[in-house]
Amino acid sequence: DIIIFERAIWKETAELSFSDSGGRQSTLLTGQRHIVQAVDIDTLLEDERVTYIKMDAEGAEMEALKGGKEQIKRNKPKLFIAAYHHDADIFLLPLFMWQLVPEYKVYLRKHPYVPAWELNFLAVV
């Protein structure tokens, strides 16, 4: 089943400020007035068994994964995570995945579509 929650996913439950200019210029800011409710995966889905997480959080992948670390440790879901927003994510994201689930096999995938810069990690047990 697919369930839609009108929330941002973050490392904790919080209120986040975003620019609402649209397109690629939408970004997390600290001084704007456009407030979005955020929640961590562990709180949002604490009574659920998560089996798959697909995430393109526009550069907030690490923070969002940190908010789901208990779900990831407990259920070892398949992960499909964007890897191209920050150069360091190529190294830091798989290290974090292995810290949570050492038996994850992590693959770097480049899909043949535009935009050409999109890289994703696939992690499976």
Give the location of each predicted region.
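Phosphate/nucleotide-binding beta-alpha loop and adjacent structural elements of enzyme active sites
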Residues: 1-125
